[in-house]
C-alpha cells in the first residue's frame, strides 16, 4: 500500500512538472507597456476637463457616513478640492490645492501626495477631534474601474477598502 502511494505521488509530481512548461505569450505587449498604457488612460480620464464629484466613505465600517468632495485634476499633477465638511476645517485656502500622482503599486493607484487640509482631513491625526489616529480615512486609492465614456471612475481606499 505504501509503495502505491509513493508511486502515485511521484506520478503526480512528474505530471505537474510537465504542465508547467506553458511559455506561450498571451499578450502582444510587455507587462510594463500595458501598465504604462493603463496609467495614461486613467490620467487622461482624470484630466479630461471635468470636475469630479467624489463620494467618500472614510471609515471601513462606514461609521461616519458618506462625504462629498468636488475635485479638479490639472495637467501639472495638481488637484483642487472642495469638501462638504469645509466648515469643520480651518483651512488655508492655498492648501486646498495639492499634488496628486497616478502610479502603479498594488494596481493602478491615485495618491494625494502632498498635504491638503480637505483631502487629508479624515486620514491625518491632529486637532480636528480625531485624536492621534485620525478619522481612519484614506488618501491612497486603487482604481477599480473606468467607464468607457470616462464619466465614472470607481476607486477603493487602500486602507479601508471603501
Please give the residue ranges for each predicted region.
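Contiguous, well-ordered beta-strand patches that form the walls/edges
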Residues: 83-141
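Sec-dependent signal peptide recognition
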Residues: 3-10
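Acidic/polar, low-complexity intrinsically disordered N-terminal segments immediately downstream
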Residues: 21-109, 148-149
Amino acid at each position: 500500500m505504501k509503495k502505491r502511494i509513493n508511486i502515485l505521488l511521484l506520478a503526480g509530481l512528474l505530471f505537474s512538472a510537465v504542465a508547467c512548461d506553458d511559455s506561450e505569450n498571451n499578450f502582444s505587449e510587455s507587462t510594463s507597456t500595458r501598465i504604462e498604457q493603463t496609467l495614461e488612460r486613467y490620467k487622461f480620464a482624470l484630466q479630461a476637463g471635468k470636475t469630479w464629484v467624489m463620494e467618500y466613505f472614510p471609515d471601513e465600517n462606514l461609521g461616519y457616513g458618506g462625504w462629498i468632495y468636488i475635485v479638479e485634476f490639472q495637467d501639472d499633477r495638481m488637484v483642487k478640492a472642495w469638501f462638504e465638511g469645509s466648515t469643520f476645517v480651518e483651512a488655508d485656502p492655498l492648501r486646498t490645492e495639492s499634488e496628486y500622482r497616478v502610479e502603479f503599486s498594488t494596481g493602478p493607484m491615485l495618491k494625494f501626495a502632498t498635504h491638503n487640509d480637505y483631502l487629508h482631513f479624515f486620514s491625518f491625526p491632529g486637532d480636528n477631534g480625531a485624536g492621534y489616529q485620525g478619522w481612519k480615512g484614506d488618501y491612497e486609492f486603487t482604481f477599480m474601474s473606468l467607464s468607457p465614456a470616462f464619466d465614472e471612475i470607481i476607486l477603493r481606499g487602500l486602507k479601508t477598502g471603501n
